[in-house]
Regions:
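Core catalytic alpha/beta fold that binds nucleotide/phospho-ligands
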Residues: 1-220
Length: 220
């Protein structure tokens, strides 16, 4: 059985940024110098600390994991065999994922966007029909349910978002989300809350043991 570990948090703006910066590695602090947006700096720091927590609690004690960038710029785990990572942040929400197979995670909260136009461009006919059947007030969250699945799946496949969003579709008519077509190689998990949606994907044909935990920001 494949193990998949997820930690996520909702930011607390009352907590000072320095609280999170103090726990970063020298490499993280060096990468952080490229950011100017305060909210981006904050979410970057929190995502790296969540990942640190996952690595420390889930990997063998003797493991010496390191982060590296692939040729495409994707963040990857080095120094340990058979483990994969994914990060997501936005709208004050941050999530980190560690899995024994290629993985992707996305967490999204409500925000102003032209979601109908995005759906018309990236959603399949079946997805658009399902979206149209939802109550008007439920439209934004229904959109996020599909969008987060697409983002998580594309990340798990290691492909570019823009070029592959429209090439995959999902069925949300059942109890659990399913990828339409050839879906045997991907396991999906989605959690829907009043103020956000979290979706995760793992590239495997085996059953997945999901470990999902919300960590209060003041415990990071």
């Amino acid at each position: 059985m494949i193990q998949a570990h997820i930690l996520w948090l909702r930011d607390d703006p009352a907590l000072p940024l320095e609280r999170f910066l103090s726990g970063l590695s020298a490499a993280d602090l060096s990468e952080l110098k490229h950011f100017r947006d305060p909210s981006r700096i904050r979410s970057f720091a929190q995502s790296r600390l969540l990942l640190q927590r996952l690595l420390a609690s889930s990997l063998p004690p003797h493991a010496t994991p390191m982060l590296e960038r692939t040729v495409s710029g994707r963040l990857a785990l080095a120094g340990v065999h058979g483990w994969h990572i994914s990060l997501s942040h936005g709208s004050g929400l941050v999530a980190a994922m560690l899995s024994e197979a290629g993985c992707g995670i996305d967490i999204e909260g409500p925000r102003k966007m032209a979601w109908q136009k995005i759906a018309n461009r990236y959603f399949s006919a079946g997805e658009q029909n399902w979206l149209a059947q939802q109550e008007a007030k439920a439209g934004p969250q229904a959109f996020l349910r599909l969008w987060t699945l697409k983002e998580a799946a594309v990340k798990a496949m290691g492909k570019g978002l823009a070029n592959h969003m429209a090439s995959m579709a999902f069925d949300l008519s059942g109890k659990h989300p399913q990828r339409t077509g050839d879906s045997a190689d991907m396991a999906l998990r989605q959690e829907i809350r009043e103020d956000h949606v979290l979706a995760a994907a793992v590239m495997t044909q085996e059953p997945v043991n999901w470990h999902i935990e919300c960590l209060p920001a003041d415990q990071l």
